């Protein structure tokens, strides 16, 4: 057998002597093999290493699973369950180590790009962005961006206007298919840190390097002995803790650095341009507040989430303030202090006599330290009060004496808002500045306070539209209206809801026993009101309505908000922004008409928040990528979203309303995922104007935010793309001819996709049998069910995320490309000359280039040989003919799509223009094959056993037969392969 060394020498397409990735990959390979030999019996370790080397056995360009499938399958099928589990764990570990390594290399490349002071000078005087357009996967840095803007003669005033209005919001979500345990994430971070230390070996002695490698090996061995699977279904609070980890460990310190990099780049290129506000990039979260289809997210959970977020912020501020007190040892003997600061010290002395008694002597001539002591006490009291509120729940009011056992916490001693904390810090900053002193730690803390406040991230409430309709229906039944709500036409509903919104009398009577669903719906609005009273409106000011179909869907939420005191009718102001989420293709097409109806209502327009110097009303709208893709396929979904943005922007402009588009992008291509830089540049010109909101799915958080430089890279990528799109992207608008072509392509693609997915009666059975979808639902990885309705088995009830997850595991990746080939083929058959137009689109239109790039990347991950093995082995005999027909349709569409994508790009191979990505994908494609076969073997045994009459697991574990293993053990093995393949594909759903 070819040795690993020979493999590395022969596979020159994968290995480069000058590539740091390959150098460190060799270290990972050696450590992986060494750990297996120490942790597994010799024969087992040898077989696992043999399996990986078998997958490596052919050169990349000659790669085909056919060449070695039989040998791998024979080894896999000969394994007992213990060996199978070890194999699944081993390959999962391998891929996770490779992922860590690639993240580290990406981080290092970003550092190099930032530290390189020589910005590449474009030789194209007409278009300094031409190099970036030619390599759209390669984002520019702030320094490079501002240099190019200057070359384009973008006026400083225009740039400053955009920076001052810029509003970027990144919203973290809990991902229903987030695979990796929090415990494992911690181990990955430690491994990454050790790899980073090893990479600076030129500064290390031989003994240092040896010690680091020993530590690395020890960490991996501990990892090997840690259970990869969640033992229990995580609670919502567990998911909250997971998401907040990235804020606490990375983002809290990264955000001031981001501002520093903007400042440096502006100083060099636009020295007179004012910096953007500290809050130009802020964060939101759905974790703990997204209740759509998740009964575990109750009002109490959302309240506890808000308290937990404030707790983390207060703890970070207490630590930072304590460090400041150590640092600011300025003495009044050697420096003056502002009168404002001295006055505040006198006020604090009266409020906090105990602190004065304890600290006055020690800090007699050190006013900053004394002031910071008072600040620390206020933060401590705020922290204590927050704990009481968290324990007491959202219905507790500390202002009511009957509820309060700690009255001293509310006697004006704690910080009642973050503004009071900011004011105290500003006093210190201004006093220092008045004597020509600056303190970077004070400036950094102020930046953090401006960005995160006490709330850390805004909690968006999300709920499905019918929940509000059902509540209104029960209400109208109780009130015995002449015409019940469900009997009203949409026109009548709008009229009645608008009348009620303009009526001052209350509509909802108190002391009524509503049904459980209605009571829960009402309680959410009451809890939001209480949240805003305690935390300020910043903590929770957006209410997202999923599956929005009509104007009444928004008016229903506004009516409930009004009834719970979230709308002040006197001033006609609302503290809750109602955000429609248009998800299906039909709803995306209907969205402009829906919003037109709402904009005609004076009361609705008056409730929109007024923003910016223009004080214009702002409407936020969310566009759903997942369900529209599941509904109509990749091409149709993306085009309808693109068209909807243009129509909505035109509508908003006509009504003198600002628009903020909220993109519900997932981690996978089938759910709107892909490189953020490329996706933002592809947005229609004029739709951003410096404002964008994007979901950051749970499954991608680790790849974007686990390391400081990775977080900065992602944040800089998003920000530069928003600036570039807003200022210079209007040169790349589509022509009417391009739009007509895309409309035809989208419609043909949609027909082909729906013909297979929605009209073929055997497709759902095919999906259930030849993918691990049922086993995926048994993973203890999310508080949210995989299906919208309990017990439902139809396609409409299945969420888009597990839909994509299942196809990814079995290597079809169907939602991300199916239908594209047919659409292109039909167009070219009608006019072969159109290939030239398609090539022009690929070169000049960022939107079309983004589409083709995503399809190309996805096609490179498809493995129909492995997919066919799933079909042949897992498909039932009675369905063999229909399954073969379905596979034949998929196979033909794949080959057609691949050939036409290559014809458009002008390349001979997929990903030919991105060597690094092609190398990574090819390596993973080869190495992941044993895991696929292993998964099929375990699924077959598990399903065969499940079909047999039930038998107690106690007996199953001990009898000698073909059912020698319990179902739980077989399921565990299958779930481990799901973990491994997810790591290998760097993708779940």
Curated annotation (Swiss-Prot):
<feature type="active site">
    <location>
        <position position="630"/>
    </location>
</feature>
<dbReference type="GO" id="GO:0006099">
    <property type="term" value="P:tricarboxylic acid cycle"/>
</dbReference>
<dbReference type="InterPro" id="IPR015813">
    <property type="entry name" value="Pyrv/PenolPyrv_kinase-like_dom"/>
</dbReference>
<dbReference type="InterPro" id="IPR022805">
    <property type="entry name" value="PEP_COase_bac/pln-type"/>
</dbReference>
<keyword id="KW-0456">Lyase</keyword>
<comment type="function">
    <text>Forms oxaloacetate, a four-carbon dicarboxylic acid source for the tricarboxylic acid cycle.</text>
</comment>
<dbReference type="InterPro" id="IPR021135">
    <property type="entry name" value="PEP_COase"/>
</dbReference>
<dbReference type="GO" id="GO:0006107">
    <property type="term" value="P:oxaloacetate metabolic process"/>
</dbReference>
<comment type="similarity">
    <text>Belongs to the PEPCase type 1 family.</text>
</comment>
<dbReference type="InterPro" id="IPR033129">
    <property type="entry name" value="PEPCASE_His_AS"/>
</dbReference>
<dbReference type="GO" id="GO:0008964">
    <property type="term" value="F:phosphoenolpyruvate carboxylase activity"/>
</dbReference>
<dbReference type="GO" id="GO:0015977">
    <property type="term" value="P:carbon fixation"/>
</dbReference>
<dbReference type="InterPro" id="IPR018129">
    <property type="entry name" value="PEP_COase_Lys_AS"/>
</dbReference>
<dbReference type="Pfam" id="PF00311">
    <property type="entry name" value="PEPcase"/>
</dbReference>
<dbReference type="GO" id="GO:0000287">
    <property type="term" value="F:magnesium ion binding"/>
</dbReference>
<feature type="active site">
    <location>
        <position position="175"/>
    </location>
</feature>
<keyword id="KW-0120">Carbon dioxide fixation</keyword>
<protein>
    <recommendedName>
        <fullName>Phosphoenolpyruvate carboxylase</fullName>
        <ecNumber>4.1.1.31</ecNumber>
    </recommendedName>
</protein>
<dbReference type="GO" id="GO:0005829">
    <property type="term" value="C:cytosol"/>
</dbReference>
<keyword id="KW-0460">Magnesium</keyword>
